[in-house]
Amino acid sequence: MKDTIRQLIQQALTRLVTEGVLPEGLTPAIQVENARDKTHGDFASNIAMMLAKPAGMKPRDLAEKLIAALPSDEQVSKVEIAGPGFLNFFQNTAALAARLDAALADAHLSVRKAGAVQRVVVDLSAPNLAKEMHVGHLRSTIIGDGVANVLTFLGDTVIRQNHVGDWGTQFGMLLAYLQEKPATSDELSDLENFYRAAKQRFDESEEFAERARGLVVKLQAGDAECLALWTRFKDISLSHCQETYERLNVKLTPADVMGESAYNDDLANVVNDLKATGLLVESNGAQCVFLEEFRTADDTPLPVIVQKAGGGYLYATTDLAAIRYRSKVLKADRVLYFVDQRQALHFQQVFEVARRAGFVHDGMQLEHMGFGTMNGADGRPFKTRDGGTVKLIDLLDEAEERAYTLVKEKNPEVAEAELRSIAKAVGISAVKYADLSKHRASDYSFNFDQMLSFEGNTAPYLLYAYTRVAGVFRKLGTPFDASKGQIVLAAPQEQELAARLAQFTETLNNVAEKGTPHVLCAYLYDLAGLFSSFYENCPILGAENPDQQQSRLRLAALTGRTLKQGLDLLGLETLERM
């Protein structure tokens, strides 16, 4: 609807320019927002106030001329001037109802992408291997997956890339420890303890550390024995990761893994190609690119080091190789990096080097979707009581157990198997939603009690809202798509719910553009609240007549399908009853 209003305003502006009311050459960004007070309309624009000065007119006078120049449209019932010159647009409820009927008849809920579809690479999760995933990996994994789901739903071709840390000095350390203490498969499967023991030896023994560094060199040189052991470690790590992904209900698979090691053979080429473009400068033996716009505190250019003096490569080198691969091989139009926002400078520099070196094709978008940290109740990064990192799988186990206790208290008569199934959905969804509902750039404090509450903007509240809708149809013994007739919007609660349902497409396009799943969370929470008001004030099963009942059933059905689709895009499992 906002796009329709923008188009109407643009047509009015063009007409006023033709008539000489407005000067030529104006290219304003036409803003259309949801009206705060629905008695004053559904949407508002400040376009008259924006253009009053160049037009040499008072805002309200220009607003009158804009209204006179607006083309008629069946979706708009009237336009009024408010305050200093706002244009307030009222939706035509009959046209709105027809749009909802069309959405209900469409398997895709009439959702369409704003603009052309693209090939989008989503870089997400990317844990360092040789250790189990910890809570710090949660945000990249689920935010990236949620955005990837939305992009796919809108029609983009999405290529997930799990840029795991599967190369580096930690593997030399593990290989050295394995030589000292040959381990069984069971011992190796406990990666966390094996890694901890190896790290302790590395820190305590210089001889061990030197041997570990030597094994890294052998590994990088392609030594068959080292490569075989490295592959074993990598496979064990990836199996742990896959177990976690499946618990989290994210769509990452082994086929999406494209780790650091995948680019090893191209790193020398990256350096040589940078040299050929004239971008490389040697500084203290290292190969660097200096970008004038990135400077140190003492105002000297900040280097992007791509090869150390000893010949080793860095993260920047691997990232440049990955960018080139994503451009030349994957043919990406857009690449989204879901990585901690503390890496913002790194990505700004790497993206700029890639552009100057010609590693990206014209029009290719490189976007760092940075995120904040998950903190404990003390506001510091989330840790165990003894100060260690919290395994992600342990966090999910605790979430399920807490959810089980909560659900069993509320439903002691439910069979054990069903209780466990409900607890799994509620517990995992609660952890994910507590994260996804926050702006990704924000830090947040992890709190089990808040996230498992059935009140407020939480997963349990939304899952329960969906079961209320499902319950209506369960009582009737009919599926969502069984209602007939047409939607008629008479009561205020019907109109408010309908207006929000019609904004699903806009919401998803917003998420896709900005990489912000919290926008979808806020929409679903709002929708659930509006359905609750509708349910309480507009009897469905006790409607006044069959036509009214069918209309309200259709509104309920579209609400249920929209809630289910939205939760599914976030990677949350819905339940038919709780």
From Swiss-Prot:
CDD domains: Anticodon_Ia_Arg, ArgRS_core. GO terms for molecular function: arginine-tRNA ligase activity; ATP binding. It catalyses: tRNA(Arg) + L-arginine + ATP = L-arginyl-tRNA(Arg) + AMP + diphosphate. It is an enzyme of class 6 (ligase). Its EC number is 6.1.1.19. NCBIfam families: argS. HAMAP family: Arg_tRNA_synth. This is Arginine--tRNA ligase. The gene is argS.
